[in-house]
């Protein structure tokens, strides 16, 4: 089942939500599960999509717009207007591939910083859709990577925490006005 929230895949003059950036405490708090999927959650998902498209992103988690809820949106097919975005509520990764891949990542909350990150190539995810219906799907390649990246945000983890090259990361962060002190390396 795919999303039925209709949002034009284009920038809006005034994005409805404000992005938060590396160093903001809201990005480090574990997000709370959503108890009930209702119109307020669907409205939030729609506003997150509008904000994501306006920032030229392909994924966005609620903590990135200052909202401590387990909600993320993903759209790796923005050039296909008929392909609906993914809306995931309370997502959980239930399986990962043994095969890992290293790909350069960026983040709307750390603008202009791009670094290599190692992640599983494929994942299985359970989640609720925007109607509260349980879903279980397999994802691979770019979509799997974006989902993992956004799910990290739901746990207070950012992609810079997963970078294996601290010297290059420090240089890149400094160039963009961010501090290495905001990075919390994960094992």
Curated annotation (Swiss-Prot):
SUPFAM superfamilies for this protein: Peptide deformylase
Q: Name one GO molecular function term.
A: metal ion binding
Q: Which domain of life is it from?
A: Bacteria
Which cofactors are reported in the record for this sequence? Answer: Fe(2+)
Write down the chemical reaction(s) this protein catalyses: N-terminal N-formyl-L-methionyl-[peptide] + H2O = N-terminal L-methionyl-[peptide] + formate
Task: Give the co-factor note.
Answer: Binds 1 Fe(2+) ion.
Any Pfam family from its record, for instance, is Pep_deformylase
GO process terms (BP):
co-translational protein modification; translation
The protein's Enzyme Commission number:
3.5.1.88
Q: Which keywords describe this protein according to UniProt?
A: Hydrolase, Iron, Metal-binding, Protein biosynthesis
- Tell me which InterPro entries the record gives: Peptide_deformylase, Peptide_deformylase_sf
Task: Report residues binding Fe cation.
Answer: 107, 149, 153
Q: Which CDD domains match?
A: Pep_deformylase
Q: What class of enzyme is it?
A: hydrolase
List the catalytic residues: 150
Q: Indicate the family of this protein.
A: Belongs to the polypeptide deformylase family.
The record's function comment reads: Removes the formyl group from the N-terminal Met of newly synthesized proteins. Requires at least a dipeptide for an efficient rate of reaction. N-terminal L-methionine is a prerequisite for activity but the enzyme has broad specificity at other positions.
Quote the HAMAP family the UniProt record gives.
Pep_deformylase
Protein's name according to its UniProt entry: Peptide deformylase
Q: Which organism is it from?
A: Synechocystis sp. (strain ATCC 27184 / PCC 6803 / Kazusa)
């Amino acid at each position: 089942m795919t999303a039925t929230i209709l949002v034009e895949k284009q920038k809006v003059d005034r994005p409805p939500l404000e992005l938060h950036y590396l160093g903001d405490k809201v990005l480090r708090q574990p997000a709370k599960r959503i108890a009930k999927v209702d119109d307020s959650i669907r409205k939030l998902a729609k506003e997150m999509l509008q904000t994501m498209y306006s920032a030229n992103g392909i994924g966005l988690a609620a903590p990135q717009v200052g909202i401590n809820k387990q909600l993320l949106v993903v759209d790796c097919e923005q050039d296909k207007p008929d392909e609906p975005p993914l809306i995931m509520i309370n997502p959980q990764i239930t399986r990962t591939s043994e095969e890992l891949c290293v790909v350069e990542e960026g983040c709307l909350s750390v603008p202009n910083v791009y670094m290599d990150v190692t992640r599983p190539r494929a994942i299985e995810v359970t989640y609720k859709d925007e109607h509260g219906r349980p879903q279980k799907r397999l994802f691979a390649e770019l979509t799997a990577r974006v989902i993992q990246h956004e799910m990290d945000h739901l746990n207070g983890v950012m992609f810079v925490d997963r970078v294996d090259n601290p010297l290059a990361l420090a240089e890149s962060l400094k160039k963009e006005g961010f501090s290495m002190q905001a990075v919390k390396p994960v094992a």
